[in-house]
């Protein structure tokens, strides 16, 4: 299956491209959801949505394409879908994982780890990892964050899709 990408900007200035490898063989429903949301038009997927929460030394969160503040988003299967499995772990920086509000509440929100986060294992479904753009793009995004998660600039997915 194809890898996915985000072209990210900070306050309208291009930061670069992040490329994700997705674990289709381990969590096919979860990766199908993410891949389709990368291909959908603005308002129906990730294109033109923002990263609403960035906490340095922890993670970068996005995927709320309906409200833009962490309260919304929806999966291609309906509002929410189940935790597929927890086979993959948060073992390093650059892991791509589903954000949720408890068991079996996956929608469209996701996060990228910027360190090991083993306390999230068994609670959040890891479905991919960053394979390009970590040092240039993800690190620059992390620098805009704060302990509260509020960002000092608008981090936007200008374009996204599959490669």
Curated annotation (Swiss-Prot):
One of its GO terms (molecular function) is peptidyl-prolyl cis-trans isomerase activity. SUPFAM superfamilies: Cyclophilin-like. Keywords: Cytoplasm, Isomerase, Rotamase. It is found in: Cytoplasm. InterPro entries: Cyclophilin-like_dom_sf, Cyclophilin-type_PPIase, Cyclophilin-type_PPIase_CS, Cyclophilin-type_PPIase_dom. The gene is PIG28. It comes from the Eukaryota. Belongs to the cyclophilin-type PPIase family. PPIase A subfamily. It comes from Uromyces fabae (Rust fungus). Its EC number is 5.2.1.8. Pfam families: Pro_isomerase. GO terms for biological process: protein folding. It catalyses: [protein]-peptidylproline (omega=180) = [protein]-peptidylproline (omega=0). GO terms for cellular component: cytoplasm. The keyword Cell membrane does not apply. PPIases accelerate the folding of proteins. It catalyzes the cis-trans isomerization of proline imidic peptide bonds in oligopeptides. Residues 5-162 form the PPIase cyclophilin-type domain. This is Peptidyl-prolyl cis-trans isomerase. Binds cyclosporin A (CsA). CsA mediates some of its effects via an inhibitory action on PPIase.
């Amino acid at each position: 299956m194809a890898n996915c990408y985000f072209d990210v900007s900070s306050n309208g200035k291009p930061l670069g491209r992040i490329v994700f490898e997705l674990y289709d063989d381990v969590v096919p429903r979860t990766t199908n959801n993410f891949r389709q949301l990368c291909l959908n038009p603005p308002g129906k997927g990730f294109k033109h949505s923002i990263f609403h929460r960035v906490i340095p030394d922890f993670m970068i969160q996005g995927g709320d394409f309906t409200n833009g503040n962490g309260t919304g988003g929806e999966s291609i299967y309906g509002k929410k879908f189940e935790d597929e499995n927890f086979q993959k772990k948060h073992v390093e920086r650059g892991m791509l994982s589903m954000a949720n509000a408890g068991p079996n509440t996956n929608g469209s929100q996701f996060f990228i780890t910027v360190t090991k986060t083993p306390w999230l294992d068994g609670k959040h479904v890891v479905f991919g990892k960053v394979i390009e753009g970590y040092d240039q793009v993800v690190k620059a995004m992390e620098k805009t964050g704060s302990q509260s998660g509020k960002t000092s600039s608008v981090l936007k997915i200008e374009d996204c899709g599959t490669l």
